[in-house]
Structures are given as structure tokens and as C-alpha cells.
């Protein structure tokens, strides 16, 4: 049922993958991603843990409508979160690649 190595081999693979995933999560938390809105007028940089690191607002927005600037900050933050999530999925997929799971079993369990 479990192929070469049996259940013991599968458990060893799972333990190794867990260690790799923990290391990858630590690395991801250190990475930074920047989201933009308003054609780059507002930029929000977050880390892999979705903590806001920096907000950049083009000075021309300060002369305009406050409500528009607030909307652009929210849109840039949401763009940064989306990009961070995509980056995290790509990085984690590389960790689970190559593990021979039984048919129908997915990770994380």
C-alpha cells in the first residue's frame, strides 16, 4: 500500500518535510513584498508574515482628496497581501515536491 519503505519510510519523509516547511516559513517571514495602487502612487511593503513594513505615498496625493488616498492605501495593502500569499504558495510547493504520498493524500494533512 505504501510502496518501497513502507509506513516507516513515509513517516520519515513526513518528518523531513515538516522540518523543511518550518525552515521555509522562517525564510518567508523575512521576505518583503510590495503592492501598488494608483499606477504606483501608493506602495505598501509587507513581510511574509503580512506585517506592514513601509507605506510610500506620492506627494501629489497629499494635495488631493483624502478619501481617495485612503482607498489607494487599502488597495495597495491588499495587493501586497495577495502577492505575499502567492509567493508563499510557490515556496511551500517546492518543499512538498517529490514526496511520494499515497494516492488521494495531500499535504498539509
UniProtKB/Swiss-Prot annotation:
Region (Disordered): 1-21
Gene Ontology terms: cellular component: bacterial nucleoid; cytosol
Single GO MF descriptor: DNA binding
Chief localisation class: cytoplasm
SUPFAM superfamilies (alphabetical): YbaB-like
Keywords for the protein's UniProt record, in alphabetical order: Cytoplasm, DNA-binding
Cellular compartment(s): Cytoplasm, Nucleoid
InterPro entries attached to this UniProt entry: YbaB-like_sf (IPR036894), YbaB/EbfC (IPR004401)
The keyword Transferase appears for this protein: no
Subunit structure: Homodimer.
NCBIfam families: DNA_YbaB_EbfC
Function of the molecule: Binds to DNA and alters its conformation. May be involved in regulation of gene expression, nucleoid organization and DNA protection.
Protein family membership: Belongs to the YbaB/EbfC family.
Name the UniProt record assigns to this protein: Nucleoid-associated protein HAPS_1040
Amino acid at each position: 500500500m505504501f510502496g518501497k519503505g513502507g509506513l516507516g519510510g513515509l513517516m520519515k519523509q513526513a518528518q523531513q518535510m515538516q522540518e523543511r516547511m518550518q525552515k521555509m516559513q522562517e525564510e518567508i517571514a523575512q521576505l518583503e513584498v510590495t503592492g501598488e495602487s494608483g499606477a504606483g502612487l501608493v506602495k505598501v511593503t509587507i513581510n511574509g508574515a503580512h506585517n506592514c513594513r513601509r507605506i510610500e505615498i506620492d506627494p501629489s496625493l497629499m494635495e488631493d482628496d483624502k478619501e481617495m488616498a485612503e482607498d489607494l492605501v487599502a488597495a495597495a495593502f491588499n495587493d501586497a497581501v495577495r502577492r505575499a500569499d502567492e509567493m508563499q504558495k510557490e515556496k511551500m510547493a517546492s518543499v512538498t515536491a517529490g514526496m511520494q504520498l499515497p494516492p488521494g493524500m495531500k499535504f498539509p494533512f
